[in-house]
Amino acid sequence: MIQPQTLLNVADNSGARELMCIRIIGASNRRYAHIGDVIVAVIKKAVPNTPLERSEVIRAVIVRTCKELKRENGMIIRYDDNAAVVIDQEGNPKGTRIFGAIARELRQLNFTKIISLAPEVL
């Protein structure tokens, strides 16, 4: 469950290292974001000499949360961290590599490019 002011790790090589959620895209009064939701975030930590800089406002899709995700078949998935992938306005990832496991639910939400770059899909 991601809400505004939540810090997230970045799961790609776009240059950002840590994000802070500012807003959840979708409804105007949504309190929490879950896996597959698009958020507006600000970069809190970044790698030097990369296109993305600190305090830059970007969009990101959530790929891992510490809160449990219950599937239709009864399986429960929980990750060790909250992580997101930086995307552009069209929904394509800005990085060329994805780190860590990604949830299968992203495929149903048409983030197929992120799924194809991921080393492991759970």
From Swiss-Prot:
One of its GO terms (biological process) is translation. PANTHER family: 50S/60S RIBOSOMAL PROTEIN L14/L23 (PTHR11761), LARGE RIBOSOMAL SUBUNIT PROTEIN UL14M (PTHR11761:SF3). The gene is rpl14. The keyword Protein biosynthesis does not apply. GO terms for cellular component: chloroplast; large ribosomal subunit. The lineage of its organism: Eukaryota, Viridiplantae, Streptophyta, Embryophyta, Tracheophyta. Coiled coil: none annotated. It comes from Cucumis sativus. InterPro entries: Ribosomal_uL14 (IPR000218), Ribosomal_uL14_bac-type (IPR005745), Ribosomal_uL14_CS (IPR019972), Ribosomal_uL14_sf (IPR036853). Binds to 23S rRNA. HAMAP family: Ribosomal_uL14. Keywords: Chloroplast, Plastid, Ribonucleoprotein, Ribosomal protein, RNA-binding, rRNA-binding. Belongs to the universal ribosomal protein uL14 family. It holds the Pfam family Ribosomal_L14. This is Large ribosomal subunit protein uL14c. Part of the 50S ribosomal subunit. One of its GO terms (molecular function) is structural constituent of ribosome. Disulfide bonds: none annotated. It is found in: Plastid, Chloroplast.
